[in-house]
Amino acid sequence: MARILGVDLPRNKRVEIALTYIYGIGRPRAAMICKQVGIPSELRTEGLTDEHIAKIRSIVEANFKVEGDLRREIGQSIKRLMDLNCFRGIRHRKGLPVRGQNTRSNARTRKGPKKTVANKKKAV
C-alpha cells in the first residue's frame, strides 16, 4: 500500500482517484500530478513503483499545501474573520450560511436539526 504524506492510498483504485484521498488534492490536481510523473491513466495504485511514489511525493510537497497545513490555514483564516467581527466572521460564529444564502426555509445543513418551540397556551 502506497503511503504519501501520512495517507494510505487504496491499492485497487486508479492512481488518479487514489490521490484524491489526500486532503487538498482533487481530480484536476491528481490528473496533473499523474501527467507530470508520466503515469498512464489506467494504472492502479498497486502497480506503482517506488520511483513513481517518490516522484509523486516530491511534486506534492513542493507545489501544494495539503493535509494538516491546509486544514490549519483554513482554520486560521476563519478564526481571523471571527476576530475581525466582520459579517462573514459573525455568520461563522453563529453557525449560519456565510455566502448570502436564504435561511428562512433552508440552510438546515449549516443550522443543524430543527429546534421545535412549544405553542403558547391560550387564556380561558
UniProtKB/Swiss-Prot annotation:
This is Small ribosomal subunit protein uS13. GO terms for molecular function: rRNA binding; structural constituent of ribosome; tRNA binding. It comes from the Bacteria. HAMAP family: Ribosomal_uS13. PROSITE patterns: RIBOSOMAL_S13_1, RIBOSOMAL_S13_2. It comes from Bdellovibrio bacteriovorus (strain ATCC 15356 / DSM 50701 / NCIMB 9529 / HD100). Residues 95-124 are annotated as: Disordered. The gene is rpsM. InterPro entries: Rbsml_uS13_C (IPR027437), Ribosomal_uS13 (IPR001892), Ribosomal_uS13-like_H2TH (IPR010979), Ribosomal_uS13_bac-type (IPR019980), Ribosomal_uS13_CS (IPR018269).
